[in-house]
């Protein structure tokens, strides 16, 4: 029950295939780059293909001289590898952590960090995770399954914030299912004054911070979390393109495209308002 439609691509062709969440196997074409893209992952990827990672996929395919097939998966992005690459409906995922062990990864094409988002009229000052411990900052909005939860736990703010955070998903039971707060909702909570501070990965916040009617400021967190058991949780991450393990030739083409198209990719990130860090 797949529906097909065509869209425009700078200098090339893009074929977007909307598939049910269970996926549908298709034969790989060496002249086609099949990218799995979530319909529920704004601002990275959307059903309308206007996410910034959708645009980066177009640039990579164009630079590599490949036809882009966007395989839209109607699930959250966390399921793209399991329900996409493992089901052989695509070979590529845009925007994975460098060195992700589930697949081959390209050279990173940008690096960013978790960030604090605050209203400008609050005058928040801080750039380390410990800086949330300030008078007047009691309510925090964040996305689940992220270092933000660890920051709140280590700051002694997690339990106090639990009921408010649960309200962001309408108190949905999180047991045995994946539950997530949209990035836009996190930023809206700060903009409206319902949350004193937002904590989330800067790339997922940037578009909504820029578009907010209430002036907001986003501050990158500069340190990392060192847990009591010695485990270090980084708060800065380099982003790469994930490629299926059995497609090393495609990875080579993607690496070359990332290099030749670096200025175009940088322009997308700048337009999105994403703050970037030097590569390690």
Would you name each region that the model predicts?
Residues 7-18:
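Bacterial N-terminal signal peptides
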Residues 21-23:
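Boundary at the C-terminal end of the N-terminal hydrophobic targeting segment
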Residues 37-41, 111-123, 170-172, 210-256, ...:
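Periplasmic-binding protein-like
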Residues 39-42, 46-63, 116, 120-181, ...:
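Bilobed "Venus flytrap"/periplasmic-binding protein-like clamshell domains
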Residues 58, 62, 70-134, 145-147, ...:
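Acidic, polar ligand-binding/catalytic clefts
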Residues 65-67, 85-95, 136-139, 185-186, ...:
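Alpha-to-beta junction loops
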């Amino acid at each position: 029950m797949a529906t097909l439609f065509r869209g425009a691509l700078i200098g090339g062709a893009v074929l977007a295939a909307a598939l049910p969440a269970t996926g549908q196997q298709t034969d790989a074409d060496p002249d086609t780059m099949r990218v799995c893209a979530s319909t529920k992952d704004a601002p990275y990827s959307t059903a309308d293909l206007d996410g910034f990672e959708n645009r980066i996929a177009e640039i990579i395919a164009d630079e590599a001289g490949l036809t882009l097939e966007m395989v839209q998966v109607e699930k959250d992005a966390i399921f793209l590898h399991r329900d996409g690459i493992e089901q052989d409906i695509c070979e590529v995922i845009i925007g994975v952590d460098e060195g992700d062990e589930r697949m081959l990864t390209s050279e990173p094409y940008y690096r960013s960090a978790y960030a604090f988002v605050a209203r400008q009229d609050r005058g928040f000052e801080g750039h380390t995770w410990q800086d949330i411990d300030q008078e007047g900052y009691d309510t925090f909005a964040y996305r689940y399954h992220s270092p933000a939860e660890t920051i709140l736990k280590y700051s002694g703010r997690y339990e106090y914030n639990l009921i408010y955070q649960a309200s962001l998903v309408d108190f949905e039971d999180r047991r045995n299912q994946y539950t997530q707060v949209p990035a836009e909702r996190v930023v809206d909570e700060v903009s409206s004054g319902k949350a004193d501070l937002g904590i989330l990965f800067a790339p997922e916040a940037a578009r909504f911070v820029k578009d907010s009617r209430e002036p907001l400021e986003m501050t990158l967190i500069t340190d990392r979390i060192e847990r009591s058991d010695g485990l270090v949780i980084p708060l800065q991450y380099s982003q790469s393109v994930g490629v299926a393990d059995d497609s090393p030739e495609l990875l080579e083409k993607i690496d070359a495209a990332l290099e030749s198209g670096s200025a175009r990719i940088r322009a997308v990130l700048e337009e999105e308002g994403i703050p970037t860090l030097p590569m390690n």
